[in-house]
């Protein structure tokens, strides 16, 4: 992630803005993330774990900072999640279902979780809760209703023509064209990666996040049982 960020800022002639937060892998604690987010889904716990480490590092470096801005909601708005990772999804179901990644399969359907209303709210908690833990107030502009409304008007089916490759490229292309039209900037676009995947190499990542969803859930339940 540091190398990609360096490349990104260098191409925009903004390299002086780069600050790297170095964290020891032993300081990444998934069970802390379970407690803070009150969740147990592995992908969310991975993201929250790395987020906690990042925010702890920022807080140590800048004790007086209070405001955070992030990009949560962008993947949901532009349907930019790997379809191959979910056996229940097809390109057709993704482009044809309104707000699929925000609210699941519909108002009357069973959601991703009995605790959260859908994927977007779960994502908001994994950012909001760690930020609150370290005294930050966050804002995710892409989750604003006005932007979601615009995203819902995008003709995904026509633009992708049944191609997952075109769907995955769509977000970067929209951002690139928008930045060029609005600011005259050639915005660098990289292949999509999850936030947490740039924090460790693959072997260290597998060791640190080896627990199953059942193990995370058992720990989550133990925290609540201990206080009843």
Model regions: which residues?
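A short alpha-helix-loop-beta-strand transition element characteristic
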Residues: 184-192
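Intrinsically disordered, low-complexity regulatory segments
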Residues: 210-216
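ATP-dependent adenylate-handling active sites, centered on carboxylate activation for C-N bond formation
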Residues: 1-183, 196-210, 221-226
